[in-house]
């Protein structure tokens, strides 16, 4: 034992420390992970919102420039002087017109719009002019360049991305990093399909891109037109590329919403895509943010979170260790105390930790205490029940009652007492048998103890196949106590039926105030239950409600008894059962005292036994007859009494009588049939047969019809017809001779009778049988 203690010493203490460490570590780790994840998501969300705002600002800045150029150029090219100029050849003598137009073009470039060049082309007079001067469309190259603009779009005014060409160019367009220009093309005149020329405003892409944020892996912003062509990009090398076949571009172009955000994968890299569609020129503004790059930027948050969690984890582990020592201190004291005193029994398994040793020790103490309490409780209960049995049987003196009552822990604190005597009505239609009666009475004992407060009753007891309980009235009046007794008895009946499926009746004594009167009270309760034969099942009978007049005059239904005995002699079981029920009903109704019941029932039983002997029927051995009176007096209900008499006497006697009659009837019927079969050729009459058999003709007629199902004359006619068919089929006897043998007056009567039964004449019947 000592070796085990050394090996397992403080095992639970280490588990407790481990538990507290886990209890403090897991929340810190979870909070740290949650904080990092939440911070990362918040950072990405903030960046997404920032990109959306940046995209809107970029759109506003660029469209402000484009709209300014568009409005200024539209206003200028719509003026009548300019339109007239397109029809002028602009020779040297028209220098003033050229100078005026050139000044206007230069004026348009003076606004802060990043315009680099303005071009005006006249198709009709074949000239064009820009910042460099006036030129003639005298070469095929220039002519083709000018004609190409009339075929590009149906719109009279549009923005387009172009490189420098022979007709429209900028000085910045010659640089490698600024090859593209954003050109505003307007066909002139604007409101006519008869194109005379065009006006073009050129903005270098490298100038407009200054209005966009700088390019980085985490900041990729560009603009595409409705065909997916990159118009502007903060990475100038990507300007002019087509993204029309890219999935995310097709998805956005197919959307009806003007703006939105979603995630996509491009070249196996996850991006956050933000887009904004322009209502001005059908361009779409895109911002692509690399999520891995964003997460790299959020790593600083992760390191800060890790540092904070590490500090919290260190503190929590320290507090866990100190807290475990503090909480374990009382457990350690208990453990060492039980370990020193060797509380473990030899047969028990050695404990695995401190708590198991303490638990086993406490269980041993509790088991010993419970056993002691249960023993004392059982002894006290048994002593109380034994005391109550002796009290009700009157085997205790006044002095013994007082001494033992107090020694059993009971207090004499009451105003009235009353004794309830309970009997089980019947075990018919229940799952119990007669052998279960004692167990059922003890079950009722337990039921009463559970459902009636202990201050309202003394210990219930089982006395002579009855259950008896003394109820207590501490302060109420006698009338209130009687009402309470009725309610309590009703409750006991309901509980017995619900829990035990039993029907019980209860007899209640008169109230008394001294325990020594319990014997008289028990006799009163038992006496009250004797009246249950007159009442129904589940009766509650108060002794003080009984008719106490002493009388020995009994009422007996003699006429009903005669009718019953006649029915038995006639073998009429149905009538016999009805008469038995009527006799018992009369006895129970007309005799109000239980002693009168017993006298009348005993008288009836004597007469039944006499009838049994008169009829020569023995249902019992002589020795058994002595027990019949004890059996019938033990029956408690009308139904039980009726069933016992019916099953033990009336029905068996009726069956015996019927069996005898059936045998006699069959013998008589067989004799009559024998005479008919051998003497059918003679003049047979029922009177003649009755004379020979020494019976009344009417009696023989009824017996024969009862046994055979047809009358005597019908049977004779049927048998003679049978013999006629046999003679016709098997002999050559003439029809006339057959009619004479069968005692027909003439052959015509025989022929008519035969044809009526068979449907053909005797001659035809004979021919039919012989032809078969």
Swiss-Prot record:
Keyword Cell membrane recorded: yes
Classification via Gene3D superfamilies: Homeodomain-like (1.10.10.60)
Protein's organism: Bacillus subtilis (strain 168)
PROSITE patterns reported for this sequence: HTH_ARAC_FAMILY_2
Binding region for DNA: 687-708, 735-758
Keyword entries, A-Z: Cell membrane, DNA-binding, Membrane, Transcription, Transcription regulation, Transmembrane, Transmembrane helix
Domain of life: Bacteria
SMART domains reported for this sequence: HTH_ARAC
GO molecular function, one term: sequence-specific DNA binding
All copies of domain HTH araC/xylS-type, residue ranges: 670-768
One GO cellular component term noted in the UniProt record for this chain: plasma membrane
Predominant place of localization: membrane
Location relative to the cell: Cell membrane
TM region positions: 16-36, 301-321
Protein name as catalogued: Uncharacterized HTH-type transcriptional regulator YtdP
Gene: ytdP
Transmembrane recorded as keyword: yes
Entry membrane topology: Multi-pass membrane protein
Pfam families: dCache_1, GGDEF_2, HTH_18
